[in-house]
Amino acid sequence: MEFVKCLGHPEEFYNLLRFQMGGRRKVIPKMDQDSLSSSLKTCYKYLNQTSRSFAAVIQALDGEMRHAVCIFYLVLRALDTLEDDMTISIERKVPLLHNFHSYLYEPDWRFTESKEKDRQVLEDFPTISLEFRNLAEKYQTVIVDVCQKMGFGMAEFLDKRVTSEREWDKYCHYVAGLVGIGLSRLFPASELEDPLIGEDTERANSMGLFLQKTNIIRDYLEDQREGREFWPQETWSKYVKKLGDFAKPENIDLAVQCLNELITNTLHHIPDVITYLSRLRNQSIFNFCAIPQVMAIATLAACYNNQQVFKGVVKIRKGQAVTLMMDATNMPAVKAIIHQYMEEIYHRIPNSDPCSTKTQQIISTIRTQNLPNCQLVSRSHYSPIYLSFVMLLAALSWQYLSTLSQVTEDYVQTGEH
């Protein structure tokens, strides 16, 4: 199936080959775990089990930053698992969320009653908290602070809906913006980045909001089936009486109009994303931050004006994901990627769309940030004849490609709420 999808995109097929035959290690080097303690090895095992996509880029981080971000992720994954567990009553869940940050200093605390798929991070929380306490104090301080704020924020939204767009921003701040702020404080604490990265919380928050809003938009149908609602009522109530009505065929035109309005809202974070990424100096941190952002940008472009959001799953091609991972390793390339997908959206804006003018305006604003009007070198350097020849040779060994690393599948399919 991936071979068929790549026929119209020969550069993606070529990049699939390069990725499998060594290109992956240039972007995501393999981590040596031989020198790790048994408890830290267990933490990395949980990291790979709960999110292979984030595990790949986390394990590619330099120095002690790698362990700090690994533990940060697992702590927040445990907190998120508590929040998501619908079998726990709100009366019991609220104090758990409020006090969760304190459990990091209780060596024996664990929670064994969760029914969620990632419950192992709660059941074996003593292993995670042990490695947390082994971190330098400068990292512990950041993780505890973010964990406390996130726990209180999650508790606030347990029994209330996202009403306004302002509330949407607030919810996304609690569950994702705080992650961006926390990471941005960890980076300079490691001395791998300048203090400004951690001081500019507005742009760090935008990094998280952009990813979270993209996931919420894409996952409309899945969330509806699970009884969850994250689209802001202020927006969708202009089109239908109930959010679930968008899934009805007779409402598809209204559904797409609302979709386009939310995507336009989300595009407003891209200028902050560009500014944030342009300040990064460490290569491993740049890759860690840039890859999820360009994946989200490609996903938004795939969702824009697309009825499929309300009918099934919208995801980018595996070859497209691999190409983005291999290209997004420097700022000029990231700018070119953003330019490409902004143009895709711009040329698909319906004249009849109520939000068309606003969409055009934000894309024009993004264009002013020195986005190059050109293709990426890796996508235009090779001639069509050369690419076709490569495809012919590659087709003979397609079975080999079927074992392509699961990391690319996760980047395409995994939405982390």
Curated annotation (Swiss-Prot):
Q: Respond yes or no to whether keyword Repressor is given for this record.
A: no
- Which biological process terms from the Gene Ontology are attached to this UniProt entry? cholesterol biosynthetic process; farnesyl diphosphate metabolic process; isoprenoid biosynthetic process
In alphabetical order, the GO MF annotations are: metal ion binding; squalene synthase [NAD(P)H] activity
> Which residue spans traverse the membrane?
284-304, 384-404
- Which Enzyme Commission numbers does its entry carry? 2.5.1.21
Describe its function: Catalyzes the condensation of 2 farnesyl pyrophosphate (FPP) moieties to form squalene. Proceeds in two distinct steps. In the first half-reaction, two molecules of FPP react to form the stable presqualene diphosphate intermediate (PSQPP), with concomitant release of a proton and a molecule of inorganic diphosphate. In the second half-reaction, PSQPP undergoes heterolysis, isomerization, and reduction with NADPH or NADH to form squalene. It is the first committed enzyme of the sterol biosynthesis pathway.
Q: What name appears for this protein in its UniProt entry?
A: Squalene synthase
Q: Which organism is it from?
A: Bos taurus
Instruction: Please name the gene that encodes this protein.
Output: FDFT1
